[in-house]
Amino acid sequence: MPLSLDLSIGLTLSERLLTQPPVPPARHLLVPDWAPERPFERPPVPAAVLIALVRRPEGHTILYTERSPDLRAHSGQVAFPGGKLDPADASVAAAALREANEEVGMVPGDARVLGYMPTYYTGIRLTC
C-alpha cells in the first residue's frame, strides 16, 4: 500500500528533525562565524517558534505571520509564530503551540509536532 502524500511528508520531516529539544551548546558553537560588535549584554531569553506545515486544497504551505508595525520588538517583521517561554509552558513545543494559538488562532490539538530544530541564538537586540 503506497504512503499518502501527507504521511510521506510527515515521515520524511520526522526523520530529519531532532526527536527532543536540544541542550543549548556554548554560544560560540552555535554561530561560529558570527562576530557581533559587542558580546551579549544580557543572558539570552528562551523562546520557541512553530514552523507549521499547513495542508490546503492546493498543497502544503508554510505558515508565516506579519508582526504589527506597532509592536515594540520585531515590529513589521515576517516571522514564524512564536515567542518567549512562559513559566506555565510544559515544553518548548507547548510554548510554540501556545504562541501560534495566540497569534493566529491555531488550535494546539490540531497540530502534531514532528520534531525539533537545533537551538539558534539570533543576537537581536533592537533599539529605537
Specify the residue positions occupied by each region the protein language model found:
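N-terminal leader/linker segments that precede catalytic domains of diphosphate-processing enzymes
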Residues: M1-A79, K84-C128
